[in-house]
């Protein structure tokens, strides 16, 4: 599909996995969608799995946004401590859309942790607390780094419970824009 089709699907409010090869315009579509949402007065959680990717969108890491930091598992004690952080819980409760760029670098286990924090903070058991979620990235890149040896931390995010429950619509961008500009 082209960028305008993907934008229309995003504007419908559905949760989406935005993907395509390098140069297909994923970042452009995200930036346009963020601009659209903010123009409507919507609060957007703009995140990425890495700090570098987050800075490209003027966002923050998903680890910081959810307050999960470097946790590889989540205890009830951890969850309560995270939710007590006023900035984190307000940010999560007030966001209407969550964007996670470079999803290929975020493991299944970490996505489940982030999603559990979001549900708890929002007080609802709907996937991601009922907010629209936009995953963006290309799973043909390297898998997540597994620092701790836990199996779920080495699996791609689409293997997570959170992804399977959300059932995001796939928007595969097929047109090459980077090469057209040269």
Regions found by a protein language model. Give the residues of each.
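Conserved ATP-binding/catalytic motifs of P-loop helicase motor domains
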Residues: 1-182
């Amino acid at each position: 599909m082209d960028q305008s089709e993907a934008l229309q699907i995003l504007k419908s409010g559905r949760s989406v996995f935005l993907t395509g090869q390098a140069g297909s315009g994923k970042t452009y579509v995200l930036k346009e969608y963020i601009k659209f949402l903010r123009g409507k007065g919507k609060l957007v959680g703009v995140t990425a799995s890495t700090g570098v990717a987050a800075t490209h969108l003027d966002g923050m890491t998903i680890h910081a946004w959810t307050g999960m930091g470097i946790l590889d598992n989540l205890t009830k004690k951890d969850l309560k401590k995270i939710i007590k952080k006023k900035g984190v819980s307000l940010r999560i409760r007030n966001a209407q859309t969550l964007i996670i760029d470079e999803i290929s670098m975020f493991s299944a286990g970490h996505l489940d942790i982030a999603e559990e924090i979001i549900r708890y903070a929002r007080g609802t058991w709907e996937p991601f607390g009922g907010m629209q979620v936009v995953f963006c990235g290309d799973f043909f890149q390297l898998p997540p780094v597994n620092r701790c040896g836990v199996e779920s931390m080495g699996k791609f995010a689409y293997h997570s419970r959170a992804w399977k429950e959300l059932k995001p619509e796939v928007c595969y961008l097929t047109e090459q824009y980077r090469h057209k500009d040269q």
